[in-house]
UniProtKB/Swiss-Prot annotation:
This is Sperm protamine R3 isoform 1. Residues 1-29 have a biased composition (Basic residues). Two isoforms exist, a major form and a minor form. This is the major form. The keyword Glycoprotein does not apply. GO terms for biological process: mitotic chromosome condensation; nucleosome assembly; sperm DNA condensation; spermatogenesis. GO terms for molecular function: DNA binding. GO terms for cellular component: nuclear chromosome; nucleosome; nucleus. Residues 1-48 are annotated as: Disordered. It is found in: Nucleus; Chromosome. Testis.
Length: 48
Protein backbone atom coordinates (compact mmCIF):
# COMPACT_ATOMS: atom_id res chain seq x y z
CA UNK A 1 0.00 0.00 0.00
CA UNK A 2 1.47 3.30 -1.09
CA UNK A 3 0.88 6.44 0.92
CA UNK A 4 -0.47 9.03 -1.48
CA UNK A 5 -0.69 12.26 0.49
CA UNK A 6 2.05 12.14 3.10
CA UNK A 7 5.35 12.53 1.32
CA UNK A 8 7.29 12.57 4.57
CA UNK A 9 8.43 9.09 5.47
CA UNK A 10 7.77 7.88 8.96
CA UNK A 11 10.79 6.27 10.54
CA UNK A 12 10.09 2.84 11.83
CA UNK A 13 11.02 2.37 15.44
CA UNK A 14 14.18 0.32 15.46
CA UNK A 15 13.75 -3.00 17.15
CA UNK A 16 16.16 -5.79 17.81
CA UNK A 17 15.90 -8.57 15.29
CA UNK A 18 14.47 -11.72 16.79
CA UNK A 19 16.65 -14.78 16.41
CA UNK A 20 15.90 -17.88 14.40
CA UNK A 21 15.34 -19.80 17.62
CA UNK A 22 12.37 -17.60 18.39
CA UNK A 23 10.92 -18.18 14.94
CA UNK A 24 11.26 -21.92 15.40
CA UNK A 25 9.65 -21.78 18.84
CA UNK A 26 6.75 -19.71 17.51
CA UNK A 27 6.19 -22.09 14.61
CA UNK A 28 6.22 -25.10 16.90
CA UNK A 29 3.77 -23.54 19.33
CA UNK A 30 1.43 -22.75 16.47
CA UNK A 31 1.55 -26.35 15.27
CA UNK A 32 0.90 -27.59 18.77
CA UNK A 33 -2.14 -25.33 19.15
CA UNK A 34 -3.47 -26.56 15.81
CA UNK A 35 -3.27 -30.13 17.03
CA UNK A 36 -4.79 -29.24 20.39
CA UNK A 37 -7.80 -27.51 18.90
CA UNK A 38 -8.46 -30.42 16.60
CA UNK A 39 -8.20 -28.69 13.25
CA UNK A 40 -6.59 -31.83 11.90
CA UNK A 41 -9.40 -34.07 13.13
CA UNK A 42 -12.07 -32.33 11.07
CA UNK A 43 -13.61 -34.09 8.08
CA UNK A 44 -11.53 -33.80 4.90
CA UNK A 45 -13.64 -31.12 3.21
CA UNK A 46 -12.52 -28.56 5.82
CA UNK A 47 -8.85 -29.13 5.18
CA UNK A 48 -7.04 -26.49 3.17
Amino acid sequence: ARRRHSMKKKRKSVRRRKTRKNQRKRKNSLGRSFKQHGFLKQPPRFRP
